[in-house]
A protein has these predicted regions:
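Extended recognition/assembly regions associated with phosphoester-bond processing machinery
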Residues: 3-4, 8-9, 31, 35, ...
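Short, amphipathic alpha-helical "recognition" segments used to contact nucleic acids or chromatin
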Residues: 6-27
Length: 534
């Protein structure tokens, strides 16, 4: 053996002996180092003391393991080399903070669910930069902690700090460390993965659909949720992080050239719903039905019939009869946007889409055809097209004169002020429809579902920041773009993804939102007329 290798072996023995002495005799690092050197007949100096001190930190024997030391552990090095099982078609991704307890029941349920659906589990290795983290500040003796690595032992087999290409159009960015207190974990990631959607590890559950050019694959950014419990400082940023901390995971199903992706959250006891399944105490069951589904904006006349039919298939699959609707009426026959466009008006005249009677009849037929469902129709901006038309135009010079006079008489009788569409539906006796007014609340479990999204605070234009800052969780429509940011979610659309006026790059997606009996919920995207492989 060379002198160099012999020296390494001796130093390794000194480090192990010093670790044992420090852990069992409650002596200082310096005393443990001196004693180990004396026993093994090795010269003690300050370099040796620092070497042993670093060894104790890296192996979690001393408190306040630094971020750099954590990343030198064998556990993290293995996580950096983690590989994806290419034979799997389903994956579950979550996140875990170092030096932090996990929710045992939740992880057990994830493991059992993964076995049931044949999924591979990956848990992204999270690190909290703040050294005053409550967990590491506990007055616990080093020997009592007796840590051999910096993550909970149960997550170590799944720990991931590598970057993976899950699918031709989907990446997992386990190598991107985002502070758990970051309020917008998806910011700055838009161009990082090119054409590919990407998943990042973070205890907040956020979702963004990015604008793409026509013909390109949809691009989503998602964060995972956590399997570790809250562990934050008592600072403002720490308390905000604690409030938004969510136990959850992302599930991915590979479906040939496509993939399906959902963000699942659990209850306090670790139980969770995912589509038709309810998982609790390690058991996988078929549940009796979901609470409600919020459909993407409908816009009859521009609706993609295949997507709408698939959405009703989703309702039947989830045993759901209660459906929230946005922008049922489109208003293309009387749109103020086209009032001064003579050639567009001529085109509508030629293809018979300028008939208000036909458009109203299609709406009635929609509710009659789907009479087995209970609908709640949220007051939307396209509903207001018709009220605006009645107020603005001179009926003597306009098309649709007969419908104008008929609806004008109804509007005069509108005592509750909800507008002409609700009044029209009440007269035609559609008993399976509840029509909301513009400021009328409609709550389902924890969610406010009575806002369309076109009006924000104090009459301003609605937006994500306004809605996520409201004092209640809420689901809106209007943007045709699925989004999730803290307590705010918006649905996509059930229309064709190109309808003429959304020129340029578009973030529109065919996407609905499911609300489960426990009050949790997530988006279900319709991809090529499918929503799952389960």
């Amino acid at each position: 053996m060379s002198k160099k290798n012999e020296r390494k072996k001796i130093i390794s023995l000194v480090k192990e002996r010093a670790s044992f002495l420090f852990s069992t005799n409650e002596i200082s690092i310096t005393k443990a180092a001196k004693k180990a050197c004396k026993e093994l007949d090795v010269e003690f100096d300050d370099n040796m003391r620092r070497t042993i001190s670093r060894h104790l930190k890296i192996n979690g024997i001393t408190n306040n393991v630094s971020e750099a030391d954590i990343e030198e552990t064998d556990v993290f090095k293995e996580a950096k080399n983690k590989e994806i099982d290419k034979s799997k078609k389903r994956f579950i991704f979550s996140w875990c903070q170092s030096e932090t307890e996990i929710h045992d029941g939740f992880l057990t349920n994830i493991e059992e669910y993964a076995k049931h659906i044949d999924a591979s589990i990956h848990i992204i290795a999270g690190r909290y930069k703040n050294p005053t983290s409550i967990q590491s500040n506990k007055n616990t003796k080093a020997k009592e902690k007796n840590l051999t690595n910096s993550w909970h032992p149960r997550v170590v087999p799944y720990l991931d700090a590598n970057r993976h290409k899950i699918h031709e159009n989907l990446c997992l960015l386990s190598d991107v460390k985002i502070q758990p207190t970051a309020s917008t974990p998806l910011s700055g990631l838009n161009g990082m993965t090119g054409l590919e959607s990407c998943i990042v590890g973070h205890p907040r559950v956020h979702l963004k659909s990015l604008p793409i050019l026509d013909g390109y694959p949809h691009k989503l950014l998602l964060s995972t949720g956590s399997v570790s419990v809250e562990n934050y400082t008592d600072t403002k940023s720490g308390k905000k992080g604690e409030f938004h901390h969510t136990l959850g995971f992302v599930i991915v199903e590979i479906d040939g050239d496509d993939f399906h992706i959902r963000q699942v959250q659990c209850e306090d006891d670790g139980s969770f719903y995912d589509l038709k399944y309810f998982v609790s105490d390690g058991e996988i069951m078929l549940h009796s039905g979901v609470e409600a589904i919020v459909f993407g904006d409908l816009h009859l006349g521009e609706t993609n019939e295949d997507v709408m039919n698939t959405s009703f298939e989703l309702s039947n699959y989830l045993k759901c009869n209660d459906i929230i609707l946005h922008d049922v009426f489109n208003g293309h026959s009387i749109s103020h946007h086209e009032r001064n466009q003579p050639f567009q008006l001529l085109k509508r005249e030629q293809d018979k889409t300028d008939s208000l009677f036909t458009e109203l009849t299609e709406m009635l037929q929609f509710f009659d055809t789907n009479s087995e469902y209970n609908f709640v129709m949220v007051r939307s901006n396209h509903d207001e097209f018709l009220d605006r038309w009645l107020n603005d135009v001179d009926w003597r010079k306009a098309n649709n004169k007969t419908e104008y006079l008929r609806l004008a008489n109804l509007l005069i009788e509108d005592k509750d002020g909800k507008g002409i569409i609700p009044k029209f539906l009440s007269v035609t006796k559609n008993d399976n429809v509840i029509c909301l007014g513009i400021d009328e609340s409609y709550r389902i479990k924890e969610w406010e579902c009575g806002m369309h999204g076109h009006i924000g605070s104090n009459g301003s234009r609605g937006g994500v920041i306004q809605f996520k800052n409201l004092n209640t969780k809420n689901i809106t429509g209007h943007t045709h773009t699925p989004c999730r940011e803290d307590g705010h979610c918006s649905v996509g659309t059930l229309t064709h993804l190109r309808v003429g006026y959304n020129k340029g790059a578009s973030s529109w997606m065919n996407s609905n939102f499911v609300i489960y009996p426990n009050g949790k919920g997530h988006h279900v995207h319709i991809i090529n007329n499918k929503f799952t492989t389960l």
